[in-house]
Amino acid sequence: MSSLTDKTRNGALKRNLLRQMLKASVFKFGEFQLKSGQISPIYIDLRECFGHPGLLMLISEAISKQVEISEVQYAGVLGIPYAALPYASVAAGNYLKKPLLIVRKEAKSYGTKKLIEGLYQPNDRLILIEDVVTTGGSILDVVKVLHTENLVASDVFCILDREQGGRQKLQDAGVTLHSLLDMQTVLTFLYSTGAIGDEQWHGIVQALNLPYTSPTKLEINSELENLSSLPYVENVRTPLAERESLTESALIKKILGIMRRKKSNLCLAVDYTTVEQCLQMIELAGPFVLAIKLHADAITDFNEEFTRKLTTMANDMDFIIFEDRKFGDTGNTNLLQLTGAQKIANWADVVTVHAVQGSDSIAGVFRKLAKDPTYRLSGVLLIAQLSTKGSLTALEGYTETAVKIANENRDVISGFITQTRVSACSDLLNWTPGVNLDAKSDSAGQQWRGVDEAIEVQQNDIIIVGRGVTSSSEPVQQLKRYRQIAWDALTRSDDSI
């Protein structure tokens, strides 16, 4: 039931699922006879979801997430006929990327006359997907059919466990039930949102012989939650000292070392257009920040003397130089831009790169420069998410692909520009823009949130702050303020600090 209140992507997904199910009239109240013959005052009609494509996709995503969390090894996905087939089809094809199998209730009298349809080999292990589990009888019938073809099925994933003996019956037969929802969660949600009252709650519990004595009311917002604003992974963040000892990246070791020495996970975005403005702000910020972020192509009088002073200041004040160039071209063009007029590779420690160009264009060129001691450049940050409203990084699959590219090239990719933690790899750092303690948005589509949300809820490591400091009449005070709040948020549960 913690999923009704926890601040995780998986929890938000379940809450959104229940909200949409309620809106789609999935929960029906009256007098209904179940397949088992039992009379129930509530009927949960998951077939209603078929008429709502968004809800069908959401359920399939949620089931797929349950499969991933379970870490069960399997070769294919089988939907229990027939109500679970749409969910199994979407989950297998769109999320799990595994073959779909179907068991017929009876073999055809023509054609191949097969009872089991799909791609499989003898002794393959399958996972089963069901919509509602009451007694578990339908699942065990399918398991018996699979055994006749030497197929193994010991795990079933369902949308709803009605908590009426099915789990135990399946367990006795060697089948583990993984449920997305159970009746306690459903009833708590319905009660908390006012869909049912005390009398209905007690009537349902009594009729279905559920082991609850009194309803629980939780504070549950009725609005849908933005799933992309929550971490993609839910494992506990590794302590900084351990991350520093585990990583093989020289840049990440350097960054984590600076963070621990200066007690700072603050990156300042110095978005000025003249060298003088930049140097003045960097002089003030240097003692308090982990990194200084620049847009070199926005500086109208950019010159080599500026980069000489910049690197000297970085060495003296112990900070990283971060050029936010957002490279996104072919490998050869990237190389020309890195070593061309502004000689970015000579003075920047790290640069940003779009994932759109693909792994080959990123890894080859940037690895070559990062391994060459004649250049200062030693790593890249891959753009996984942006903080602007309507960003195309929110398109399905973009962030996941960026994470895959980074995971496979951790010697040169040191982390992400992101809104939330997107990778389970502890040696990839999550840098997040869009942080402001005093404003929520501007007129150009920029959206901001607070430090605690960015660090503790969304599990980012480093905050990137710009106008919250640079537009202030007291920038040093703001630097101290952001540094302290961000560091406290990052290290609150870190025993290594």
Swiss-Prot record:
GO terms for molecular function: orotate phosphoribosyltransferase activity; orotidine-5'-phosphate decarboxylase activity. Residues 233-496 are annotated as: OMPdecase. Its main location: cytoplasm. SUPFAM superfamilies: PRTase-like (SSF53271), Ribulose-phoshate binding barrel (SSF51366). It is found in: Cytoplasm. InterPro entries: Aldolase_TIM, OMPdecase, OMPdeCOase_dom, OPRT, Or_phspho_trans_dom, PRibTrfase_dom, PRTase-like, RibuloseP-bd_barrel. Pathway: Pyrimidine metabolism; UMP biosynthesis via de novo pathway; UMP from orotate: step 1/2; Pyrimidine metabolism; UMP biosynthesis via de novo pathway; UMP from orotate: step 2/2. PROSITE patterns: PUR_PYR_PR_TRANSFER. Keywords: Cytoplasm, Decarboxylase, Glycosyltransferase, Lyase, Multifunctional enzyme, Pyrimidine biosynthesis, Transferase. It catalyses: orotidine 5'-phosphate + diphosphate = orotate + 5-phospho-alpha-D-ribose 1-diphosphate; orotidine 5'-phosphate + H(+) = UMP + CO2. It comes from the Eukaryota. UMP binds at D271, K293, L294, H295, D329, T333, S387, Q446, Q447, W448, G466, R467. Bifunctional enzyme which catalyzes the formation of UMP from orotate in the de novo pathway of pyrimidine biosynthesis. May also form UMP from uracil. Regulates the size of gut granules during embryonic development. Involved in resistance to DNA damaging agents including UV-C and X-ray radiation. NCBIfam families: pyrE (TIGR00336), pyrF (TIGR01740). In the N-terminal section; belongs to the purine/pyrimidine phosphoribosyltransferase family. In the C-terminal section; belongs to the OMP decarboxylase family. This is Uridine 5'-monophosphate synthase. The lineage of its organism: Eukaryota, Metazoa, Ecdysozoa, Nematoda, Chromadorea.
